[in-house]
Swiss-Prot record:
A motif (JAMM motif) lies at residues 173-186. GO terms for molecular function: metal ion binding; metallopeptidase activity. The keyword Cell membrane does not apply. It comes from the Bacteria. This is UPF0758 protein IL0240. The keyword Zinc applies. One of its GO terms (biological process) is proteolysis. Keywords: Hydrolase, Metal-binding, Metalloprotease, Protease, Zinc. InterPro entries: MPN, RadC_JAB, RuvA_2-like, UPF0758, UPF0758_CS, UPF0758_N. Coiled coil: none annotated. Residues 102-224 form the MPN domain. It comes from Idiomarina loihiensis (strain ATCC BAA-735 / DSM 15497 / L2-TR).
Length: 224
């Protein structure tokens, strides 16, 4: 039975209009975005299957185009729809960080870094440059390496800090393996960058490692 044959009160679009987006399930919201089902499934069932196959909204939105195209019912147009949603969410999180005291809201920082780094297929070292009020000046991906290592040079970090006159820094990198636990190499790199920043009186506020779960904070672990 198609969604159009459902009781009006159960249809996602009508629920959105009468109750608000916050009352819709992930599958119902995704169904509105997709517009139609696939392979005989109504759009809500199709959306539920996608979420189940990928393991949730975050994994679906950060999946690669190749992973998405491997699913029955997803073609280039739907891949582009999902990519647009992810990019809009990234820009919204960046907008929030630019207008708020972002470091006092670590969840927001973690969400932003997850959206930027979790989908990367190789290791990436990134930096958040902050002003004296800890508001975001710029996000920059400095180095990309193999899946096992990304070379980090403190002088490149310093160069970028000086270019944007940053007062504080947050470091971040991803572990494509999915295991976010900081390695000894991660800790050594963090210490090297911290010492270099100290010479120019710039604070290193945190270093996040992004994996499959919640990003790991060096500050929360007492590793800074």
């Amino acid at each position: 039975m198609s969604v159009k044959e459902w009781p009006v009160s159960e249809r996602p679009r009508e629920k959105l209009q009468t109750q608000g987006a916050e009352y819709l399930s992930d599958a119902e919201l995704l169904a509105i975005l997709l517009g139609s089902g696939s392979g005989g499934q109504d759009v809500v069932s199709f959306a539920r299957r996608l979420l189940s196959d990928f393991g949730g909204v975050g994994a679906l939105l950060t999946a690669t185009p190749e992973q998405l195209l491997a699913c029955n019912g997803i073609g280039p147009a739907r891949v582009n729809q999902l990519r647009v949603v992810l990019e809009l969410s990234r820009r919204y999180l960046k907008w929030q960080l630019e207008r708020s005291d972002g470091f006092t809201e670590p969840t927001m920082v973690k969400d932003y870094l997850t959206s930027q780094l979790r989908h990367q297929g190789r290791e990436v070292f990134a930096i958040l440059l902050l002003d004296s009020q800890h508001r975001l000046l710029r996000y920059e991906e400095l180095f990309q390496g193999t899946i096992n290592a990304a070379p980090v040079y403190p002088r490149e970090v310093i160069k970028l800090v000086m270019q944007y006159n940053a007062a504080a820094v947050i470091l971040a990198h991803n572990h494509p393996s999915g295991v976010a636990e900081p390695s000894q190499a991660d800790q050594r790199v963090t210490e090297r960058v911290k010492k270099a920043l100290t010479l120019i009186d710039v604070a290193l506020l945190d270093h996040f490692v992004v994996g499959a779960g919640d990003p790991i904070s060096f500050a929360e672990r007492g590793l800074l």
